[in-house]
Amino acid sequence: MIRVAYNNQFGGFSLSNEALALLSEYKGIKLDNYLASELPRHDSDLIKVVSELGNKANTSISSLAIKELSSPYYRIIEKDGREEVVEPELNGFIKID
């Protein structure tokens, strides 16, 4: 199961101080919001932090959510800070492993 973190409100993707501290602990390096925003949104530690903290991971400009993907492909589309996770329509395609 692949999961992706995204921001579900206008404002922008950002993590609370508590979430940044926990993510930094998991990663073993000091992260700020800029560095955390460079992580892939499917990063397992990021998903773990958002899952564990729930609303405590949010800031005044973010409402973080997690989407489970049906395939290993996704794109995040952002408008005014609000994000949508989009998966391609792959029905009928054959995947070579």
Please state what every model-predicted region is.
Residues 2-96:
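Catalytic phosphate/metal-binding cores of nucleic-acid and nucleotide-processing enzymes, i.e., regions
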